A protein has these predicted regions:
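C-terminal substrate-recognition regions of SAM-dependent nucleic acid methyltransferases
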Residues: 5, 87-192
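SAM-dependent methyltransferase catalytic region
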Residues: 1-82, 87-91, 100, 104-116
Length: 192
């Protein structure tokens, strides 16, 4: 409540990011701030919250959003539906947002699977109903072919994704391959 007002529904298109000083460089590396607006909206305890934001949070390929925030979004199971656009121009013609955009419906009283609709392009839409972190990857698998591969791998070995001794993640770096932050690295014993 604010001044004795109650909020049943909050709708927003929050600012996406803070410029990190590089106006001509890699804008997808700017510090994301949209999660702060989502958190503030949740504190108002609305019944429903819907916002449109860049999709990079779903794959953890974003600067500025804490892992805990992403974990909470994936595991609280309060998002009843996500409409995800791989190409932001399919949602906002003429606007390029790296990684695409999504809008979601967060429901305070909901605790079930999410209806995930992926707009691959104007003619191809993929839909599934599942918990956002059902494969325990700690990201939303956007690619419909990849999700089927991961499900098959999980059937063969349920611990494969989380056990770095069994999977590929122990020998490669997940991001920032060629930036000044880190070079391409590997712990593979035969890496030269």
């Amino acid at each position: 409540e604010i001044f004795n007002m109650k909020f049943d529904v909050i709708v927003g298109n929050p600012p996406y990011q803070l410029n990190v000083g590089n106006t001509t460089g890699n804008s997808c590396k700017a510090k994301s701030i949209n999660h702060m607006f989502i958190e503030q909206a949740k504190k108002l305890n609305p019944r429903y919250l819907t916002m449109i934001v860049p999709s990079r949070w779903m794959t953890r390929s974003v600067e500025g959003i804490p892992d805990k925030w992403i974990d909470d979004m994936l595991n609280e199971n309060k998002i009843s539906v996500i409409y995800d656009f791989l190409n932001s121009q399919d949602c906002f013609p003429g606007v390029q947002i790296e990684g695409g955009v999504n809008y979601f419906l967060w429901d305070r009283d909901y605790k079930k699977e999410c209806r995930y609709i992926l707009n691959i392009n104007k003619d191809t839409i993929y839909e599934r109903v599942d918990f956002l972190n059902s494969n325990k990857t700690d990201i939303i698998i956007r690619d419909p072919f990849a999700i089927n591969i991961i499900k098959k791998v999980n059937i063969l070995n349920p611990n494969y994704i989380k056990n770095s001794e069994q999977n590929f993640s122990s020998i490669v770096s997940p991001k920032d391959f060629f930036t000044n932050k880190t070079l391409l690295t590997s712990s593979w014993k035969d890496y030269k």
